[in-house]
């Protein structure tokens, strides 16, 4: 909440969006209540909540919740649904949970160079990705493999996990002699 302290001061950049990554770059996952708490504070300060869902499916599997529970039911306004880190080739989708927020987005999308010629060939992957729960199966497999790796690494006294393994990423602290 302290991050919005400069709000209303003309000499300070005005915050307008809180962006969270689910799951995080460290492989940890925001719990639903944490998302709700962040969204509540953001909305109290007239800010939107964006979820970077580059590893969205991995977080869903980790929490064993529905997409709705982790997004709009928890206060998320916009989701960037990533497929690239879970089996797609450069495919992402932006989902606005409040239609009034779309505004000039199609024009900004084009102007920013993110609307490529023949984009439909990239976008078509998303249909296959969500069909037959491919995205969930891929995420379950990746999360399971990360857990197996974590458990195996825990058998080494000189290797320490940097973060709990809650999704598909494993980070470790290695002793200098192992690194060298």
Where are these regions (language model features)?
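Conserved PLP-enzyme active-site core in the AAT-like
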Residues: 1-163, 167-180
């Amino acid at each position: 909440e302290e991050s919005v302290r400069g709000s209303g001061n003309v000499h300070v950049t005005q915050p307008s969006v809180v962006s969270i990554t689910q799951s995080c770059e460290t492989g940890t996952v925001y719990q639903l209540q944490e998302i709700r708490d962040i969204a509540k504070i953001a909305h109290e300060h007239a800010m939107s909540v964006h979820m970077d869902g580059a590893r969205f499916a991995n977080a869903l599997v980790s929490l064993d919740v529905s997409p709705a529970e982790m997004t709009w039911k928890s206060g998320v306004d916009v989701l960037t649904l990533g497929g690239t880190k879970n089996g797609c080739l450069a495919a992402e989708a932006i989902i606005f949970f409040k239609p009034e927020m779309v505004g000039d987005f199609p024009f900004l999308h084009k102007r920013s160079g993110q609307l490529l010629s023949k984009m439909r060939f990239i976008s078509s992957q998303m249909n296959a990705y969500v069909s037959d729960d491919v995205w969930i199966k891929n995420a379950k497999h990746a999360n399971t493999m990360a857990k197996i790796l974590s458990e195996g690494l825990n058998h080494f006294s000189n290797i320490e996990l940097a973060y709990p393994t809650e999704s598909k990423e494993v980070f470790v602290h290695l002793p200098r002699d192992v690194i060298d």
